[in-house]
Amino acid sequence: MAIAWIVLDLTGSEKTMGLINSVPGIAIISMSLFGGVLADRFERWRLLWQTKLAITFLSLLTGLLLTFEIINSSTIWYLIPISLIIGMLFALHNPASQAFVLDVVGKRNLVSASSFSAASSTIATIAAPSLGGILLWLGYDWSFYTLAIFYFSSTIMILSIKKRHKSVIVEKSNNVFYDVKSGLLYAFRNPLIRSLLIISITAIFSGIYQPVIPVKIKNDLGLGEFEYGIVLAMNGVGALIGSIFLFIINERIRKIYLLIISFLAFDLGVLIFGFSPNYAICIFAMILLGVGFASWMVTIPVLLQTNTSDEMRGRVISLYYMTILTYQLGWFFGGMLLESFGIHVSVLIATIGSLSIGATTILFSKSLRSAN
């Protein structure tokens, strides 16, 4: 949120905003498989707190660079190496984080745990953008100092976990690349996992839509940081509503229906937001987007984890993050589309691309349609 607004405000360039926000995705996509191997080989708890602490330091560093005006309109590129390193850290953190949840709660409670986790995290998604809008108004550096505090608090919470399970002990080959190859072959040969990963690639179209949000609020509607924060918070409200609903119905509805709901709600929200004539409709669209996102998060990650062997779980989750975090590459393409064609064309391309891949995969994958 903060970097997108800062870059757009300092440079006035949608393309530059998209480029800088796409950088973490490059690191995550290129390193996630190795993060998955580490999650399978070593204790996940240790990986989690160490990577989170490093991200805390980088957030603090970014805040200091903004405070002393070392980062400005002519040195905005300093954000590129920082974003690249943060992306590398998340590439190591994400597979371990997802796999660690299953270590603690087990497969039987994974759906409920995922719904509860999504509901808890979306409370922060509601509060953080609202607070972030105020912090951006007070000063760009405030946002990163606050992020550093939250990341450090998260580190302390991870360290305080008493009940933790070590990763399943598996035979370790001497060649990390062999482990990567075995993970790729395992995922490709499993029809359900393969279909879920193809579906996840639609995240790049979500990324194409992301630059539309600050441009719509700042340039189209002429609003400021606070309104930008509020509209992002409404995405969290929608996700919270969706998470609570999914927690209640739990396993009463087949996962394929939840997946269809996620596509329809999200892509309809994208269209409404892009063509909305006023701020109120933008808020409604963001709530709808949040509902779609919640349905996604309680469908695809859960199906992947519950249909993957224990010794391959970290690598499969890393593949999931490689595909879903193509949305950050979408930032770059979205920025280019915005500068060249505007908001309406951008959201149309994002919606058509997402629905086309999603519908085709569901139609031709029997294993996905029968998954539950």
Language model feature labels by segment:
Residues 4-10, 63-71, 127-146, 219-220, ...:
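Transmembrane alpha-helix termini and helix-breaking/packing motifs in multi-pass membrane transporters
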Residues 41, 47, 61, 181, ...:
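C-terminal transmembrane bundle of multi-pass solute transporters/carriers
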Residues 163-197:
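Juxtamembrane intracellular "pre-TM" segments in multi-pass secondary transporters
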Residues 64-82, 274-285:
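Helix-loop junctions at membrane interfaces in 12-TM secondary transporters
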Residues 8, 61-70, 86, 158, ...:
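MFS-fold secondary transporters
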Residues 1-27, 185-233:
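Helix-loop boundary and gating motifs at the non-cytosolic
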Residues 1, 23-37, 43-56, 78-136, ...:
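Substrate-agnostic recognition of the 12-TM MFS/MFS-like secondary transporter fold
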